[in-house]
Design a protein with these regions (language model features):
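Secondary-structure boundary elements
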Residues: 1-66
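His-Asp-centered catalytic microenvironments across diverse enzyme cores
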Residues: 2, 7, 11-14, 96-233
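Generic structural hydrophobic/aromatic packing signal, biased to beta-strands
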Residues: 23, 82, 89-91, 133, ...
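Functionally constrained cores in energy, signaling, and assembly domains
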Residues: 27-30, 78, 121, 126
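Active-site neighborhood of thiol-dependent amide/isopeptide-bond enzymes
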Residues: 51-117
Length: 233
């Protein structure tokens, strides 16, 4: 039963040479299961920077090539690396309130964005239980800069890709626990799926063709510029 959560798919293309080369270079398969999950998690969180790709449906190897991603795309890469290293995983789909993206989204891009934005996290099967892992979305360097930008915020925070109850101490480190960074912004729950391919067949970002074109070619570049400004402060 659990074996299906190890299978390769079109989006989880872990036989891709670039992914296999990365796994060999990082020597993840030589680690015990806990350290393997933790090392892959930290790589996806901190080495794949927070940013906005052209589409949620890109494959894992494209996310690796881009070197950046958001919840859905970083999740795709995370799942591919986990499965390639014999760690069972699945995906859980949601929507989040667009207020969570304010700051990364600004001006017309924010005003024209759908109220509910497609979202997902990865669930990992380890020691006979499923862990909900969402805290890999923002790299630590970006989060640190954001915390420095809002030094007086001691409690809940919503914006710039964050929705948490404790802004100063979000649960983003995996140590046999679930991790979260956007969960306080969830508005709808679509349930769990075997792979992102299946999730996206049933649920995806609702927007017109024109808005989709504008996002891919204009909007996301403004958003990535806003993220870059936070990093440079």
């Amino acid at each position: 039963m659990i074996d299906k959560y190890l299978k390769e798919t079109c989006m989880l293309d872990y036989s891709n040479p670039a992914i296999q080369e990365l796994i060999q270079k990082m020597k993840w398969k030589e680690l015990d299961e806990f350290e393997r999950i933790k090392a892959i998690y930290n790589f996806v969180r901190d080495d794949i920077l927070f940013g906005y790709n052209e589409d949620d449906a890109i494959c894992a190897s494209k996310v690796l090539f881009d070197g950046y991603g958001q919840c859905n795309t970083k999740g795709t890469l995370f799942m591919a690396l986990l499965r390639a290293c014999q760690i069972p995983c699945r995906i859980h789909g949601f929507t989040i309130d667009k207020r969570l993206q304010k700051g990364a989204m600004t001006g017309l891009v924010y005003r024209s964005a759908p109220q509910n934005i497609f979202h997902s996290w990865v669930e990992v099967y380890f020691e006979n239980q499923w862990y909900e892992l969402e805290g890999f979305i923002l790299d630590q360097a970006y989060l640190n800069k954001l915390q420095n930008q809002f030094p007086n915020c001691k409690g809940a925070f919503c914006g710039y890709g964050v929705a948490v109850k404790d802004f100063r101490n979000p649960t983003i480190d995996f140590n046999r626990n679930s991790t979260y960074i956007q969960s306080e912004g969830i508005t709808q729950d679509f349930g769990v799926y075997y792979c992102p391919d299946d999730l996206l067949k049933e649920h995806h970002q609702q927007m017109s063709r024109l808005k989709g074109f504008a996002y891919r070619h204009i909007g996301r570049h403004f958003m990535n510029r806003n993220v870059k400004r936070v990093r440079q402060r």
